[in-house]
Amino acid sequence: GIACLCDSDGPSVRGNTLSGTYWLAGCPSGWHNCKSSGQLIGACCKQ
């Protein structure tokens, strides 16, 4: 999957660890959305 920035990673993409995974169809079962304000399409999810 594509790495994405969770809220817990910090405010900026630069120099931060991207601990989330981007899912176009939303988070799969057992995962949770880790970004409170994100894209209109898809979700940044963590296991």
Swiss-Prot record:
Biological process terms from the Gene Ontology for this record are: regulation of signal transduction
What this protein is reported to do is described as: Produces a positive inotropic effect in mammalian heart muscle. Modifies current passing through the fast sodium channel (Nav) in neuroblastoma cells, leading to delayed and incomplete inactivation. Paralyzes the shore crab (C.maenas) by tetanic contractions after intramuscular injection.
GO molecular function annotation? sodium channel regulator activity; toxin activity
Q: Which GO terms describe its cellular component?
A: extracellular region; nematocyst
Provide the taxonomic classification.
Eukaryota, Metazoa, Cnidaria, Anthozoa, Hexacorallia
Pfam families named among the record's database cross-references: Toxin_4 (PF00706)
Keyword Metal-binding on entry: no
| Family to which the UniProt record says this protein belongs | Belongs to the sea anemone sodium channel inhibitory toxin family. Type I subfamily.
Q: What is this protein called?
A: Delta-actitoxin-Ael1b
